[in-house]
Amino acid sequence: MPVYIREYKQLGREAYGGAGVAIQAGLEPAIKQQAPIAIGASSVQSEPFDDDTALVLITTNAICHIEFGTNPAANTNKHRLAADAAQFFAVKPGSKLKVAVITGT
């Protein structure tokens, strides 16, 4: 089962391009769709996020644990995502962060 990572530069707005109220979704089109990461018994890292990425959408078909960092290592004590989860995370642009994934229960 893979984890999918979609990168966004900014949040969507009620009035596109204006000063409308931010909505809890990335502004499409996303700036990058990473190759899926296979979830397994060992921690696996994503590619570094794009310099303009400020928001990532992580989706997964299976229970897993994730960790963010410049050289992250996920384990079963890290942030848990439920099966069929889709969750946004804010990241600092230009920080060269990655996400690591490992299977969980």
Task: Please tell me what each predicted stretch does.
Residues 18-52:
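Surface-exposed ligand/attachment interfaces on beta-rich extracellular proteins
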Residues 54, 89-103:
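Noncatalytic modules at the cell exterior or secretory-pathway interfaces
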Residues 50, 60-62, 93:
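Short loop/turn positions at the edges of beta-strands in beta-sheet-rich folds
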Residues 39-44, 76-93:
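Short, solvent-exposed S/T- and G/P-enriched segments that are highly enriched in secreted/extracellular
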